[in-house]
């Protein structure tokens, strides 16, 4: 029974009511789903796309990156990277498949993945590296010096989202920009 154009009021009302069970996880997912639905309703009522409701275009072009370079046999990974290069991508995100439980051999495999991708895309492109919270602080601190030579634009979510001190310590190493917060 609320007016969808009162979206800020509705959002704050929902957010305040999550205090008892925490402001993370499913509660925030539910708020996000309702928020998206409100914007969609407002767009339908006004017959405008949501980006116009949010203030309109701010740039002529938006940079995008190829984001599916998963751990796989090296030849397949390189073939996939080549297809992205042919499509004109200049930014790429790869994902590591090995972590602390895989020991030195896993580290070696991660380095081989980075080498294989860089071999195809070259160094005049951006390479982002995704860990999907699969590493711990110690493993990440040992991997970073091995990854610096690949000139990554960032290392994404090396440790779990709640490890604020770990993120701070990695950031203070100042070797590779650290990205996180997607799974907060």
Regions found by a protein language model. Name each.
Residues 173-178, 182-183:
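Ligand/cofactor pocket segment of small-molecule handling proteins
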Residues 31, 36, 152-153, 178:
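Residue-level recognition of hydrophobic positions within alpha-helical transmembrane segments
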Residues 1-45:
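Metal- or metallocofactor-binding catalytic centers and their adjacent structured scaffolds
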């Amino acid at each position: 029974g609320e007016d969808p154009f009162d979206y800020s009021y509705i959002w704050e009302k929902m957010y305040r009511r999550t205090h008892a069970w925490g402001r993370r996880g499913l509660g925030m997912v539910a708020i996000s789903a309702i928020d998206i639905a409100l914007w969609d309703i407002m767009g339908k009522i006004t017959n405008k796309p949501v980006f116009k409701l949010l203030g309109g275009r701010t740039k002529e072009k938006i940079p995008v990156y190829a984001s599916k370079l998963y751990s796989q046999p090296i030849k397949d990974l390189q073939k996939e990277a080549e297809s992205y290069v042919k499509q004109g991508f200049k930014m790429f995100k790869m994902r590591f498949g090995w972590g602390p439980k895989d020991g030195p051999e896993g580290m070696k495999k991660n380095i081989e993945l980075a080498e294989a991708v860089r071999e195809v895309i070259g160094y005049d492109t951006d390479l982002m590296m995704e860990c999907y919270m699969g590493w711990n602080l110690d493993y990440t601190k040992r991997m970073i010096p091995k990854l610096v030579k690949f000139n990554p634009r960032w290392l994404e979510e090396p440790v779990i989202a709640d490890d604020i001190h770990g993120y701070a310590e990695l950031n203070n190493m100042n070797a590779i920009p650290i990205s996180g917060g997607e799974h907060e």
